[in-house]
Amino acid sequence: MTQIRPFCGLRPVPEYAAEIAALPYDVMDTEEARQILNKNPLSFLRVTKSEATMSDCIDPHSQAVYKMAKTNLDRYLSDGQMKKDTTPCYYIYRQQMGQHIQIGLVAAASVEEYRENIIKKHELTRHDKEQDRVNHILATEAQTGAVFLTYKGKPEINTYVLSLMGAKKPVYDFTSEDGVQHTLYVVENLMEIAELTRLFEDVPVMYIADGHHRSAAAMRVADELGKTPRHGSNEEYNTFLAVIFPDNMMQIMDYNRLVKDLNGLSMEEFLSRVGEKFEISELENGPKPEARHQFSMYLTGKWRRLTAKEGTFAADDVIGSLDVSILQDNLLAPILGIKDPRTDERINFMGGIRGLDVLASKVDAGAYSVAFAMYPTSMEELIKVADAGKIMPPKSTWFEPKLRDAMVVHLIGEDE
């Protein structure tokens, strides 16, 4: 049983929604954010990457940066560009990227259910990244970025959500510069809110798809603010901003690997070592892997197909049978010397949204010696890992389309 609740969202006035809504803070660096803000000063990156509105030499983790985030957030309200809903609402967020459509419910999810693993995790978090989000939430008194949650889809929820969409007009409907259509509906009717809440009570567990640092930070903030004696369990900080999608609407793309050198091996030595654990063949149908346990390798201007040999991985191991584990355990670590992909500077990662031509061009330009195109991790694999209480290897999943920040913001201050 999961418990969600509506909240009074802070969101853009409709005429400003397309300009304010922004990609998440963690998919770009400060310079990229600065370039976006130069073109579009209203972008919510003013809040989520407020260092981009300050001097080049500013420490992005200084208190001045978090204070600037609060100043910039307040300015949206004082300038009349964002307003807070006066009654608690749910929000339906529809995204379309090409032929792919996903429809999620924006709601306040329970910190306590996260703590009790009713909301399940599959990634490790880094303390420094958690602390950054803690500082940001405390300074702004807001959760500005949503946690991307999923659940095993239920037809009755889908049917009801679609019926609500059919009966309402969207408050926003715009296409962002990356070609993704974003549509938002507000659910403010008390009976409709009660029905959505009831329907989700029949969902036994939910899973974090993306946003492990945001959810971990929300729990730490709740622990800190919960020390205030006069506060109770209904405080807004005991929940976190989430967009909840059924698993059958989620789209995971490939998360590909680039390695700077061959670890001192010649090309012939490298291919010989690779051939011990993988069948190597010529590619006939383009570079994308066509099935699990297949990989496409780009080396010296040529794509090759790698297929994991039988017996080189434990097929019944939920972690060991993942393609990212097979490549790491049988090639990246033993042959290329990449022992810890989280920290090794010789490896880089690229989301499949950028395409395999870009991957190959990085090798052709000499920045890397070899690239590996992956078959996407499936939602079924992610859920199995989370249900087993295990941790996915780093850089296993790349979700598209990305949620836009500022579609709805969750305020957690004392007056909320």
Model-inferred region functions:
Residues 1-416:
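Surface-exposed, charge/polar-rich loops and edge strands
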